C-alpha cells in the first residue's frame, strides 16, 4: 500500500496501519514543501515525523519531534544571541545533521532518507515526494511567509489571502515514488492538511493522471466545519474550498474512489456520489493506537471493494 502523508493526522493513521500490515508492504510518500534550511541543516518536518513514528521514537504528546528530547543546543544558541526560527531538540538536530551531510556528499534527498530509515531500523519505505526543491508560501496581508514562518513563527494567526507552492511546476515525482506507483494499485491519502500537506504531492506534474489509474481512498481531516488540528480550515477557505469533508472530497474528486469521513459529521453520505466517489462513515478522531488500528482496518478493507480502473 502507498500512503500519502504530511506531518499531522496521517502519522496517527500510520500508527494503526503498522499494527495490521507488515512494514515492508507500506510505502509512505511524504510532503517536502515545508522543508527548510536552519543553521546549515535541512529540516524535513513531515519526513522526520514519519521516521520517528516508525522507529517508535516520536513524542506522542505533541506528535512531532523525539520523545524525551532535550534542547541544550537551542538554548545555548539563544544565550549566544543566535535566534533560530524553530525550536529544535538535540536528538532531532542530530537527524538533521546526518541528513544534511548525506546531501552535501552529493546524494539525493530520497537516498538520504533511505539511508536514515536504515539507520533507524525501519522496514517501511519512506520516500520524499520529490528530489527537487519545493516550498509552500502563505500570502498574508503584511508579507509573503514560508509556511513554517506562518505556522510556527506567527502561530498560524495571519489572515491567509492565498497559498503558493513555489517550484512545483518544475519539480518531478521522485523515481522511487514512480517505481512504487508502477508496482502498487492501492493509494491511501491520509488525513493531513489537504492544501499544504497533500496538495504539493498531488500537484506534482503527472501525479493526478497516475492516480486516476489507481484505487484511491482518502480520509478526511475535517469533522463538521473544522479541522481536527492545524490551519487546514483557514487555508481551504483561502483556496476557495468549503471547510468541510465535502470540500476535501471536492479537492480530490479527479481521482478519488472512496472518501472516509467522521461518523459525527452531518454530511450526507449520498451527496458524495455527485463528486463521483463513494463515502464511508467511521470514527476518524484516532485518540489512541487502538482507535487508529480500528480505522486502519476499515480503510484497508475498502480497497477490496474498488474495481481498479
Curated annotation (Swiss-Prot):
Native organism: Methanosarcina barkeri (strain Fusaro / DSM 804)
InterPro entries: CofD, CofD-like_dom_sf, FbiA/CofD
Entry similarity comment: Belongs to the CofD family.
Protein known as: 2-phospho-L-lactate transferase
Subunit structure of this chain's protein: Homodimer.
One GO MF term attached to the UniProt entry: magnesium ion binding
Signal peptide residue numbers: none
Lineage: Archaea, Methanobacteriati, Methanobacteriota, Stenosarchaea group, Methanomicrobia
GO biological process, one term: F420-0 metabolic process
Keyword annotations: Magnesium, Transferase
Top-level EC class: transferase
UniProt cross-references to HAMAP family, sorted A to Z: CofD (MF_01257)
EC number(s) from the headed UniProt entry: 2.7.8.28
Pfam families (alphabetical): CofD
Top-level lineage group: Archaea
Pathway(s) this gene product operates in, as recorded in its UniProt entry: Cofactor biosynthesis; coenzyme F420 biosynthesis
Its biological purpose: Catalyzes the transfer of the 2-phospholactate moiety from (2S)-lactyl-2-diphospho-5'-guanosine to 7,8-didemethyl-8-hydroxy-5-deazariboflavin (FO) with the formation of oxidized coenzyme F420-0 and GMP.
Catalytic activity: (2S)-lactyl-2-diphospho-5'-guanosine + 7,8-didemethyl-8-hydroxy-5-deazariboflavin = oxidized coenzyme F420-0 + GMP + H(+)
Cofactor(s) recorded in Swiss-Prot or TrEMBL: Mg(2+)
Residues that hold 7,8-didemethyl-8-hydroxy-5-deazariboflavin according to the record: 48, 87
Amino acid at each position: 500500500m502507498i500512503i500519502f502523508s504530511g506531518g499531522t493526522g496521517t502519522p496517527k493513521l500510520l500508527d494503526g496501519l503498522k499494527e495490521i500490515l507488515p512494514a515492508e508492504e507500506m510505502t509512505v510518500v511524504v510532503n517536502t514543501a515545508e522543508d527548510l534550511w536552519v543553521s546549515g541543516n535541512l529540516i524535513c518536518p513531515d519526513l522526520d515525523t514519519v521516521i520517528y513514528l516508525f522507529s517508535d521514537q516520536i513524542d506522542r504528546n505533541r506528535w512531532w519531534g523525539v520523545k524525551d528530547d532535550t534542547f541544550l543546543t537551542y538554548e545555548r544558541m539563544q544565550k549566544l544571541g543566535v535566534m533560530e526560527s524553530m525550536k529544535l531538540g538535540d536528538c532531532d538536530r542530530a537527524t538533521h545533521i546526518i541528513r544534511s551531510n548525506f546531501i552535501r556528499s552529493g546524494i539525493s534527498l530520497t537516498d538520504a532518507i533511505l539511508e536514515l530509515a536504515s539507520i533507524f531500523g525501519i522496514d517501511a519505505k519512506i520516500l520524499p515526494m520529490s528530489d527537487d526543491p519545493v516550498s509552500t508560501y502563505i500570502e498574508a496581508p503584511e508579507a509573503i511567509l514560508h509556511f513554517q514562518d506562518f505556522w510556527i513563527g506567527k502561530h498560524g494567526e495571519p489572515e491567509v489571502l492565498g497559498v503558493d507552492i513555489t517550484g512545483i511546476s518544475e519539480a518531478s515525482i521522485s523515481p522511487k515514488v514512480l517505481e512504487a506507483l508502477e508496482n502498487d494499485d492501492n493509494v491511501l491519502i491520509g488525513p493531513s492538511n489537504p492544501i499544504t500537506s497533500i496538495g504539493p504531492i498531488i500537484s506534482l506534474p503527472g501525479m493526478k493522471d497516475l492516480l486516476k489509474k489507481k484505487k484511491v481512498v482518502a480520509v478526511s481531516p475535517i469533522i463538521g466545519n473544522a479541522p481536527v488540528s492545524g490551519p487546514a480550515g483557514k487555508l481551504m477557505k483561502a483556496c476557495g474550498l468549503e471547510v468541510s469533508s465535502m470540500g476535501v472530497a471536492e479537492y480530490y474528486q479527479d481521482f478519488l474512489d472512496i472518501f472516509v469521513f467522521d461518523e459525527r459529521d452531518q454530511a450526507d453520505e449520498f451527496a458524495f456520489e455527485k463528486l463521483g466517489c463513494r463515502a464511508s462513515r467511521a470514527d476518524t478522531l484516532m485518540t489512541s493506537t487502538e482507535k487508529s488500528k480500528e480505522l486502519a482496518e476499515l480503510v484497508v478493507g475498502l480497497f477490496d471493494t474498488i474495481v481498479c480502473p
